[in-house]
Each structure stands twice: as structure tokens, then as C-alpha cells.
């Protein structure tokens, strides 16, 4: 049994969906009605990710969806709301955001790979194997930092590499749960360093 009951999960999904929709409606004033289509797409794919007749997460699409819905869409939409345009220069930052957040999904799928394989959940780690999952975790974090060479997120790399070494050493089991917290902290640090680097570059 998991830590969260199905009823609590449904309640949590409903509350977070309503909160996200409320925030999105507030942004329509600044970004225009076209943002409504973006919001609807986000809600639709959030549902299709693990629900519906063919859950995308069970078909190995999770990592690609993270790049789109945690990278290109939020970064692009944020830029659009503030400037009214989405220049091509936004793409590297958007990809970096998607890659660094994907490290959390990769680690989660790495931890659950054996159970996922038994239940028919064909994540990228299940399809490619544990060693490939370890390499993807390392590459995603380092790739995100490489896309921001002129900015501060390079300081994130040593922490990410240290987390990767622990991941390889642990291999499997509940001890990987603590590494999820470490990876989340590293993602937060990456975001703060990126924001600070952009702010300093504009000075």
C-alpha cells in the first residue's frame, strides 16, 4: 500500500487542478485569451498522463511530456505574458528547465523499474534498462547546465554528479526515496541560480 489513499489522491488532484485553473484565469488579463488554449492543453495532458484508455506514462512518453509541459510551455508562456512574444532565444532556457525537472522523473522511474515492468508500465527506464537510466539521469542534469554556460547553474553540476553517484551506488530499494529529496533540492537550486544569472545579465 502507498502512503496516500485513492480518495486523498482524487481530492488532491481536484484541489490542485482548481488552484492551477484559478491562477491561469488571472493571467488571461495579461496574456490574452490564447492562453486559455494552453491551459486546456495542460489539463488534458495531465489527465491523459496516467488516465484514459491509453495512459501516456505507461507508453514511455513521460520524459517527452516533461520537456514540453515543464519546459517549453511554462517558460514560453511566462515570457509571452511579460513581453507579448516568445523569441527563439527562449528555447535553450526552456529546454534546460525541462531537462533538469526530468531528472526527478528519471530517478522515480529508475527506483520503480522492476515494479513498473511487472505491471506493464513501459517507461523509458524499463525500455532501455537500469544502466541507460543512470546515464540519462546524469546527462539530463549536465545537459541542462550546459545550455546555460554563461549563467550560474554550472554550480549545480557537482551536486547533480554527487546525486548520480549515490544513485548508481544504491541501485534499488527504498534508500532511493531520500535521493528524490536530494534531486528536488538540486532542481530548486538550479532554478534559483538560473533566475539570479538572468537578473545579473540584465544589469
Question: What is each residue range found by the language model?
Answer:
Residues 23-27, 77-81, 104, 147, ...:
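Alpha-helical membrane-inserting segments
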Residues 89-103, 115, 130-171:
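Alpha-helical transmembrane segments
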Residues 150-203:
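Extended hydrophobic alpha-helices typical of membrane-associated regions
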Residues 3-85:
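Intramembrane alpha-helical segments
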Residues 1-30, 121-150, 184-193:
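Multi-pass membrane catalytic core of lipid/isoprenoid biosynthesis enzymes
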Residues 36-47, 87-107:
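Membrane-embedded alpha-helical segments that form the functional core of polytopic membrane enzymes
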Residues 64-79, 97, 126-130, 181-194:
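Small-residue-rich segments of transmembrane alpha-helices in multi-pass membrane proteins
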Residues 1-4, 105-130, 164-178:
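Cytosolic, membrane-interface loops and tails of multi-pass inner-membrane proteins
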Amino acid at each position: 500500500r502507498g502512503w496516500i489513499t485513492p480518495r486523498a489522491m482524487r481530492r488532491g488532484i481536484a484541489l490542485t487542478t482548481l488552484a492551477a485553473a484559478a491562477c491561469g484565469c488571472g493571467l488571461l488579463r495579461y496574456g490574452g485569451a490564447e492562453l486559455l488554449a494552453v491551459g486546456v492543453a495542460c489539463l488534458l495532458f495531465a489527465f491523459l498522463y496516467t488516465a484514459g484508455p491509453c495512459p501516456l506514462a505507461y507508453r514511455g512518453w513521460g520524459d517527452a511530456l516533461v520537456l514540453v509541459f515543464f519546459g517549453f510551455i511554462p517558460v514560453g508562456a511566462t515570457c509571452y505574458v511579460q513581453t507579448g512574444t516568445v523569441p527563439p532565444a527562449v528555447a535553450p532556457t526552456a529546454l534546460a528547465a525541462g531537462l533538469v525537472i526530468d531528472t526527478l522523473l528519471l530517478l522515480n522511474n529508475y527506483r520503480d523499474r522492476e515494479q513498473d515492468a511487472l505491471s506493464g508500465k513501459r517507461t523509458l527506464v524499463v525500455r532501455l534498462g537500469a544502466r541507460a537510466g543512470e546515464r540519462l539521469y546524469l546527462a539530463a542534469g549536465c545537459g541542462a547546465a550546459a545550455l546555460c554556460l554563461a549563467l550560474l547553474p554550472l554550480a549545480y553540476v557537482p551536486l547533480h554528479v554527487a546525486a548520480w553517484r549515490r544513485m548508481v551506488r544504491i541501485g534499488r530499494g527504498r534508500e532511493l526515496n531520500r535521493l528524490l529529496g536530494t534531486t528536488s533540492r538540486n532542481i530548486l537550486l538550479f532554478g534559483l541560480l538560473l533566475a539570479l544569472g538572468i537578473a545579473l545579465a540584465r544589469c
